[in-house]
């Protein structure tokens, strides 16, 4: 299965996978508005391939069922919360 991957012009780290190059008709208009102008990254064959930060099966299922897959970046790490947890662990010892 081939798909086209686009990056968002509005949300850093967000990528949109669609079945047909430049055919955004399956993507809800609200999502396209939030995504901004899509910038083509690549066309890729998903068969026998691993993707760095997303489960390939989820991509394939979403493409078949919805006609698109949205990859969002992981949430930013809360450094203050991490510091508090580390400090609490040190105090337990």
Curated annotation (Swiss-Prot):
InterPro entries on file: YcgL-like_sf, YcgL_dom
Domain YcgL: 1-84
Superkingdom: Bacteria
The name this protein goes by in its record: YcgL domain-containing protein VSAL_I1068
Biological classification of the source: Bacteria, Pseudomonadati, Pseudomonadota, Gammaproteobacteria, Vibrionales
